[in-house]
Amino acid sequence: MSLQNLKITFHLDGTGLYYDPYEPIHLDALMSWALMPFHRQKGDEAPTRDSVPIDVPLPLGKWHINGHWGWNASALFPEGETGESLQFWRKKFRQNKIEVTQGSPNLQNGIYREYNNPLPLLLTNKMVAYAVGDRGRVHQILRKHIRYLGKKAAYGKGHVLSVDVEIINNDYSILKDGKTMRFLPFSDGIRQVRVRPPYWNNFEKTACAEIGDELSILK
């Protein structure tokens, strides 16, 4: 496997994606999600937050910091002109349907649950990430499996039109201009999170720096 410095560009349809800069999408998480079905057996129980996760092998380089290791893959960032908005996703119980229910409907849980959730909408045509990896394999995985980014894909948000993977001179997978490009272990960090996928899992959580923190000591 030939490892090279890469820039990955996701070209979007411009209708926006639900992107939270405080909980950003990581490139290695997308690739791990895409390949996970090939590493699970039929009938396996669904993983929980506290179960020991599968480390899906990826065609990427690895970093080692403070006794931890992870993949040379950054978070995703918007590139070019952008706009921001806040949309609310609402669901209300239809009062004219109350006669088809038995008893009093539970509006807090279950099928009658009401909600009014704000979601940050990012308007952009491009999302980019950086990695050290095998260009051909990275391109193949992303082109074949990643059709949407972010939440509400079923409603057409975050639609990926195409993916470009180009070779670049510098490694920006973990640091760029002295600032972190992904979650990295840092003893003074306030975020408790895993340093490789799945990031939602609790196993081996550790203190990490926030994306954009200045950590030139890690150069």
Where are the language model's segments positioned?
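RNA-interacting cores
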Residues: 1-219
